[in-house]
Curated annotation (Swiss-Prot):
It comes from Rhodopseudomonas palustris (strain BisB18). Catalyzes the synthesis of GMP from XMP. It is an enzyme of class 6 (ligase). Keywords: ATP-binding, Glutamine amidotransferase, GMP biosynthesis, Ligase, Nucleotide-binding, Purine biosynthesis. GO terms for molecular function: ATP binding; GMP synthase activity. The lineage of its organism: Bacteria, Pseudomonadati, Pseudomonadota, Alphaproteobacteria, Hyphomicrobiales. GO terms for cellular component: cytosol. Its EC number is 6.3.5.2. NCBIfam families: guaA_Cterm, guaA_Nterm, PRK00074.1. The active site is at 101 (nucleophile), 191, 193. Residues 24-217 form the Glutamine amidotransferase type-1 domain. This is GMP synthase [glutamine-hydrolyzing].
């Protein structure tokens, strides 16, 4: 995605259509790489949460009026002269506060405690011992018990602020959890939001439900109703165009917008010839025949494959595909005529990634949407009905809207499509081999009942041929690589541990059923050091 344009709400502006209707928690971001996980854990409790950089938090707090605040972790040291701080207006607002890692340290220091640089740094799995009871531990941890947590810190609290007591300790931090029951301030040196702290979600649940007293009334049904109202208010009698990619995000956005404004929406589906087997037909059938949404289907395969001929560099592939997509989409949009708005399936992580925790431009802005840049070129305003949602929430909304499970639950698919699953030069022959191999592999996974247990699975056509023997003859054909990973957010991933019998059966089917392949390998690289996709 490009940085949000002037037609889009600021990434740190509280979302207006949820601000008045539900209990909310504000998450003050100090730069942790896992701050998004805090928001997800809170939302799992049915409570709406938003992330804002620490230097935007005071204004966001005043506008959002949250019922509680969470201070995130971060890479800085509170001992630095220019260390980020939580706004004093938030600390004195009378709302419950939970500090995590750096959030604990700055909370303690700002309230009069002492934080020192640790001689014993803690990174990774650690064990804490509960020394006293507190509301966070209710029904989860008991006094005297020892529990696994995930630490990532150098500094530590050595003297408590007035009103606080220490309720847990660890080898590298004798005060690992602190509590001020009167003010409902709690903080911990470890990270409860990550899966490596087994009971972390339960601790966050206790803060949300028992400490803050929030009932959790934010549901996808409520979001759907409020989003429809917002779309109608924004669009009025105007026309909207939406680019469909074949993925879940744009599909859910299109169905939601169509429910709000009907045939004021026209979808444009550019088939660049790099989709999975029968994917173009699936998209057309779903939107044109099942939902009766006005749809322009553009078969641009020859154009894209012609421009990609001889291109082997993966970044040049991406740029070529992006440029062509924009050109084709823009041409179709002009032919439709009269559109005032451009719809995009922007998600909340896209919004967060466009602004760093200091409030300035982020070092890396991910280009998630092929239509980035079109609003300015075509003088259209953006409609982004999913910009407050995470990927898993979009799937829930899709089910709420009645999209078929086979569509909603499908694995992520990259914008450049099969182009980045075919390292080296792309040809129509290679794409056909790859499509067929991928279809057999996914079919085998579904038949084994494993599809929903895997974050993403796909086949890759390697740019090499190997010698083989089939029947009584020698073959010299392509190698197919199989990839399957487990993940919660795609930021990190582990390879899926198939049984050898499964891999053997999948390889046999691919070699027997897909012409042009005589060897199959399985990729057991995790992320990091590798990436999920090969290019």
């Amino acid at each position: 995605m490009t940085a949000p344009s002037k037609t889009s709400a600021s990434p740190v502006d509280p979302s207006p259509h949820v601000a008045a209707a539900h209990d909310k928690i504000l998450i003050v971001d100090f730069g942790s790489q896992v701050t998004q996980l805090i928001a997800r854990r809170v939302r799992e409790e049915g409570v709406y949460s938003e992330i804002v950089p620490f230097n935007k938090a005071e204004a966001a707090f005043a506008a959002m009026k949250p019922k509680a605040v969470i201070l995130s972790g971060g890479p800085a040291s509170v001992l630095d002269d220019d260390a980020p701080q939580a706004p004093l207006s938030i600390l004195t607002a009378g709302v419950p506060i939970l500090g995590i890692c750096y959030g604990e340290q700055t909370l303690a220091k700002q309230l009069g405690g002492i934080v020192e640089g640790g001689h014993h740094r803690e990174f990774g799995r650690a064990q804490i011992e509960i020394t006293d009871d507190c509301a966070l531990f209710d029904g989860v941890w008991e006094k005297g018990g020892k529990y696994d947590v995930w630490m990532s810190h150098g500094d530590r609290v050595t003297q408590l602020p007035e009103g606080f007591r220490g309720v847990a300790k660890a080898a590298g931090s004798p005060i690992s959890v602190i509590a001020d029951d009167a003010r409902k301030f709690y903080a911990m040196q470890f990270h409860p939001e990550v899966v490596h702290t087994p009971d972390g979600a339960k601790l966050i649940r206790n803060f949300v439900r028992k400490v803050a007293g929030l009932k959790g009334d934010w549901t996808m049904r409520a979001f759907r109703e409020e989003a429809i109202e917002k779309i109608r208010a924004q669009v009025g009698s105007g026309k909207v165009i939406c680019g469909l990619s074949g993925g879940v995000d744009s599909a859910v956005a299109a169905v939601l917008i169509h429910e709000a404004i009907g045939d004021q929406l026209t979808c444009v589906f550019v088939d660049h010839g790099l989709l999975r087997k029968d994917e173009g037909k699936t998209v057309v059938d779903l939107f044109r025949h099942h939902y009766n949404i006005p749809l322009v289907h553009v078969d641009a395969a020859k154009l894209f494959l012609g421009e990609l001929e001889g291109v082997s560099d993966p970044e040049l592939k991406r740029k070529t595909i992006g440029r062509l997509f924009i050109n084709v989409f823009e041409g179709e949009a002009k032919m439709i005529g009269g559109a005032d708005f451009l719809a995009q399936g922007t998600l909340y992580p896209d919004v967060i990634e466009s602004v760093s925790f200091t409030g300035g431009p982020s070092v890396t802005i991910k280009s998630h949407h092929n239509v980035g840049g079109l609003p300015e070129r075509m003088n259209m305003q953006l409609v982004e009905p999913l910009r407050e949602l995470f990927k898993d929430e979009v799937r829930v909304l899709g089910r709420e809207l009645g999209l078929p499970e086979v569509f909603v639950g499908r694995h992520p698919f990259p914008g450049p499509g099969l182009a980045i699953r075919c390292p080296g030069e792309i040809t129509a022959e290679k794409l056909e081999i790859l499509r067929n191999a991928d279809a057999v592999y996914i079919d085998q996974i579904r038949k084994a009942g494993l599809y929903d247990k895997i974050w993403q699975a796909f086949a890759v056509l390697l740019p090499v041929k190997t010698v083989g023997v089939m029947g009584d003859g020698r073959t010299y054909e392509y190698v197919v690589g199989l990839r399957a990973v487990t993940s919660t957010d795609g930021m990190t991933a582990d390879f899926y541990g198939f049984e050898m019998s499964f891999l053997g059966a999948a390889a046999t089917r691919i070699i027997n059923e897909v012409k042009g392949v005589n060897r199959v390998v399985y990729d057991i690289t995790s992320k990091p050091p590798g990436t999920i996709e090969w290019e």
